[in-house]
Regions:
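Domain-length cofactor-binding catalytic modules of enzymes
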Residues: 2-47, 54-60, 67-77, 82-87, ...
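An acidic- and aromatic-residue-enriched active-site/binding cleft used to recognize and process polar
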Residues: 64-65, 93, 101, 246-247
């Protein structure tokens, strides 16, 4: 399906057959594409672009396309000579992390009455225990997982660091996009977060899930579709996996605010500002006196601070789950299959030109050729597509479809807004809750909460906003990936229990 933009181009909508795109999302997409007019305006006024061939090259939307904030979720754009900071959202390096384990379903289910309280304690009741000093936090923000690897001795195995194995973490860099490290030369605006260089302290960010559709979930492999790939990746029917979905939280939102200040400061004076509020940041050219290089470097530094935090946050959430399960059951094997962002800007050379792939709520789905010199060279990039809370999730392998800008969905995509979902079908919601195991900061079964209808009402609304009926059918979404040769299914998973903040 092609959507004409009114500016001489079109956007490819890779949607399920018969799936009518959300009207509000389509209107938002049309408004977003007014940025083509902004590009032409910048060319006419002169001096804005540092590269002579700067252009907007292509846009597609993935099957989980739905309304966002200015730019729809599921949007992928390719530009040359400039970036669009808003096109990766503010939760920079929101992404997915997936572990295989040697755990068995029977031992998990038989221990839920003791395991779920321990998970709640570690995630929400003061058991997180991730002490870090300023040296570590700065290394994390500048170099991501590599920075933590180089400074892990500072914490002396305290708290969750007791589950941090340096050799394992070094090996897992090969199973993480960008090796878990996108370099930054500065930590603008983050001095208070970093803290004292040599004093161990705690913060309320690292090891946090965040709100919305973020989660940590223990899953059972229900069905295998590609036996060869599944075997190579350690995926077995009935096996237990741990999937993590979160990002850079407050760090990312602060970086997003700084990036908006940077982009607006570089907008030419006397030129009408874009009606859609979407600004461009030009890549610097040969003339370094025009301030473009400084703005460009600031942008990438603050973006990469957040991205590096996102990688570290998902890693620590994995260690926290490992700690909870080990404390109740037994020491167990956890192997990282892959960690991949779905809110970021990728640099890619195409036809000899440096281009930028912007993904907002869309993940990379490179094929075998693009994954050469990685552990996935013979299969394609792992793609994790979770369904709504309580429904199936899928593991796929990327097929490197250039028409889809080497991209795939990052989820099922909303069908109802959060407000609409809160007023969903009561009977359907109750049936869902009867068999669904969820861990949240609030335990609704606590005796002291039975008389607090206000707290329980708010808790129920937060769960309803993410209930299955609020999202599109994940099976149809995955089928579109097959049809358009974006990614091929490897396995389907079902939740055992879910952790939501």
């Amino acid at each position: 399906m092609e959507l004409k933009t009114g500016f001489g181009s079109s956007v490819s909508l890779l949607l399920a057959e018969g799936d009518k795109p959300e009207k509000r999302a389509v209107e938002e997409l049309k408004g977003m594409m007014e940025l083509e007019e902004t590009v032409e305006r910048m060319k006419v006024c002169g001096g804005f672009f540092g590269k002579p061939d700067s252009t907007f090259r292509k846009a597609v939307v993935t099957p989980d396309f739905h309304k966002g904030a200015g730019i729809p979720i599921g949007t992928v754009m390719m530009t040359e000579g400039f970036v669009i900071p808003q096109a990766m959202g503010n939760d920079i390096n929101c992404g997915m992390r997936l572990y295989t384990t040697d755990l068995r379903e029977d031992e998990i289910r038989s221990s839920l009455t003791s395991l779920l309280p321990e998970v709640r304690r570690i995630f929400f009741e003061g058991g997180r225990n991730i002490p870090m000093n300023g040296i570590q936090r700065e290394a994390m923000l500048r170099e991501g997982l590599t920075g933590l690897l180089e400074t892990c001795g500072e914490a002396e195995n305290k708290g969750i660091w007791g589950f941090y194995d340096r050799d394992v973490q070094e090996r897992e860099l090969n199973y993480t996009a960008f090796h878990g490290s996108v370099k930054a030369d500065d930590t603008e605006g983050l001095r208070d977060f970093i803290g004292s260089p040599h004093t161990l302290s705690y913060d309320d960010q690292i090891g946090s899930i965040g709100g919305g559709n973020h989660f940590v979930e223990m899953q059972k492999v229900e069905e295998i579709y590609d036996g060869q790939t599944a075997n190579a990746w350690g995926i077995k029917k009935g096996g237990i996996l741990i999937m993590i979905h979160t990002g850079s939280l407050t760090i990312g939102h602060q970086s997003g605010r700084i990036n908006q200040i940077i982009t607006k400061s570089m907008y030419p004076r006397g030129v009408p500002h874009p009606d859609n509020g979407i600004y461009l940041l030009a890549q610097p050219g040969a003339d370094v006196r025009d301030g473009k290089e400084s703005a460009w470097n600031r942008f990438w530094n603050t973006t990469n601070n957040a991205a590096d935090f996102g990688f570290a946050n998902r890693m620590f959430l994995g260690l926290m789950m490992q700690g909870a399960v080990t404390g109740v059951l037994r020491p167990h094997e956890m192997k990282l299959l892959y960690d991949s962002p779905h809110n970021y800007i990728w640099k890619k050379e195409i036809d000899g030109q440096d281009c930028f792939i912007h993904r907002k709520g869309a993940c990379s789905a490179r094929g075998m050729e693009e994954m050469a010199d990685t552990p996935f060279a013979y299969y394609g990039e792992p793609v994790m597509i979770p369904g709504s809370m309580g429904s199936s999730s899928y593991l796929l392998k990327g097929m490197g479809n250039q028409e889809a800008l080497w991209s795939a969905s990052h989820g099922a995509g909303r069908r109802l807004s959060r407000g609409e979902a809160i007023h969903g079908n009561d009977r359907e919601f109750q049936a869902f809750m009867e068999h669904f195991h969820i861990v949240t900061p609030i335990d609704p079964g606590r005796n002291d909460l039975k008389g607090r209808s206000d707290i329980l009402k708010k808790w129920g609304e937060s769960i309803r906003s993410e209930a299955p009926y609020a999202y599109k059918d994940i099976h149809k979404v995955v089928k579109v990936h097959e049809t358009h040769r974006m990614a091929g299914p490897v396995a389907r998973m079902e939740p055992v229990f879910t952790v939501k903040a």
